[in-house]
């Protein structure tokens, strides 16, 4: 207990701690806080206040967990084709209203812009990509379609880190289309890369510094990467010396840009390489315990300490420690598994949660995430997505 008469009290902005000022040394006492109440008291400050504490307050400055409002959005097979919810340490909030103009049909890919001022989806029918302003109030009025549309089903979508470009992976040649992006929406389509991917594009990602764009696709080499600049695509990087073993559906760069991972068909289902300014390095060793089957999505945690894979057979999602040496020993499966084929996976911006889009209701499943792996499953969102979720994305806006 505090050691004297309590004088003031305050919660941290993310609700994970509570502090009390009081008479008698140490004059301030703090505890973890959760839905179960008080946790074990934190150690006293090394330098104590000099006398009775009269007031206490938590600051947002420099704290990425408390300086943002967070959101989670899902691409889905059935109308309204995209849904979004507030996100917090408690899990899903009440669903935002649907956009006034819905995507045309099944959404396969979804992405917030880096500053979360926009939310974009890739979908099956024209215009094959739809984008909306995003704010704490939810969806804004849909941006005008790009003047030159992707030519067939949009499957993957990504914004460049500086939000100056948006790229769509799609199933018909040229297999990837990219556009300038601004607060006004889509600009004039960039020229196609001189050397195209070799088959239908399913996933796309930019490197963290925005200097590279990579596409996961059908057909060897299954992943194709290009330099990226304000002028668009550069000359294709050489293929990796050891390619993935089948058609690829997801691609992701590590947060430090030092690795690239590809998820797809055929064992080992996940393939990762060092990445540098010269392109692909020598393939990392496969994880000792492979994902159970064909992989559909891949994501690194924001701090780069973990990598997760969504796949087609139980446990539907597999996660591993990640380091400069590659894969670590697989984390234990979550105690409550997703209910069907894992299609997409993503970590929250602060790395405290992980969400999986999948077949079978509830269609999206989320867990706390820590250095120990999966925590106890969050309650399902209400209302649920009304059909399976091929992709999931988190966003956040500074308070």
PLM features per residue range, with description:
Residues 23, 77, 124, 171, ...:
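Short loop/turn segments immediately following the C-termini of beta-strands
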Residues 13-14, 60-68, 114-115, 161-162, ...:
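Residue-level detector of Asp-centered blade-edge/turn motifs that repeat once per structural unit
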Residues 26-31, 80-85, 127-132, 174-179, ...:
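Structural motif
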Residues 6, 53, 107, 154, ...:
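Conserved positions at the start
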Residues 365-368, 386-399:
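Blade-level signature of beta-propeller repeat domains, shared across WD40, Kelch, NHL, RCC1
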């Amino acid at each position: 207990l505090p050691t004297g008469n309590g004088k003031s009290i305050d919660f941290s902005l993310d609700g994970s701690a509570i502090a009390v000022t009081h008479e008698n040394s140490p004059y301030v006492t703090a505890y973890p806080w959760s839905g179960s109440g008080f946790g074990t008291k934190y150690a006293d400050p090394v330098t104590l206040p000099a006398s009775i504490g009269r007031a206490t307050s938590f600051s947002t400055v420099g704290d990425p967990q408390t300086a943002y409002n967070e959101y989670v959005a899902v691409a889905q097979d059935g109308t309204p084709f995209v849904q979004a919810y507030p996100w917090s340490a408690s899990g899903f909030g009440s669903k935002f209203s649907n956009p006034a103009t819905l995507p045309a049909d099944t959404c396969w890919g979804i992405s917030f812009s880096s500053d979360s001022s926009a939310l974009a989806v890739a979908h099956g029918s024209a215009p094959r990509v739809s984008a909306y302003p995003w704010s704490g109030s939810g969806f804004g009025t849909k941006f005008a379609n790009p003047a030159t549309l992707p030519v067939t089903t949009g499957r993957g979508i990504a914004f460049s880190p500086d939000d100056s470009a948006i790229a769509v992976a799609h199933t018909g040649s040229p297999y990837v289309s990219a556009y300038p992006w601004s607060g006004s929406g889509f600009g004039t389509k960039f020229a196609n890369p001189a050397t195209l991917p070799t088959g239908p594009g399913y996933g796309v990602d930019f490197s963290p510094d925005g200097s590279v764009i990579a596409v996961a696709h059908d057909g060897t080499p299954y992943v194709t990467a290009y330099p990226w600049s304000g002028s668009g695509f550069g000359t294709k990087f050489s293929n990796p010396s050891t390619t993935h073993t089948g058609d690829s559906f997801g691609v992701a760069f590590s947060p430090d840009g030092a690795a690239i991972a590809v998820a797809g068909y055929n064992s080992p289902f996940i393939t990762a390489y060092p990445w540098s300014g010269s392109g692909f390095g020598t393939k990392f060793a496969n994880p000792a315990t492979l994902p159970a089957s064909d992989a559909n999505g891949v994501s690194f945690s924001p701090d780069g300490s973990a990598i997760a894979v969504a796949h087609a057979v139980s446990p539907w999602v597999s996660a591993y420690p990640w380091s400069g040496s590659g894969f670590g020993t697989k984390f234990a499966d979550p105690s409550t598994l997703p209910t069907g084929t894992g299609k997409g996976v993503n970590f929250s911006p602060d790395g405290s949660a992980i969400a999986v889009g999948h077949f079978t209701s509830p269609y999206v499943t989320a867990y706390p995430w820590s250095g120990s792996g999966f925590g106890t499953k969050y309650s399902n969102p209400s209302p649920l997505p009304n059909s399976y979720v091929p992709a999931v994305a988190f966003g956040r806006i500074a308070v």
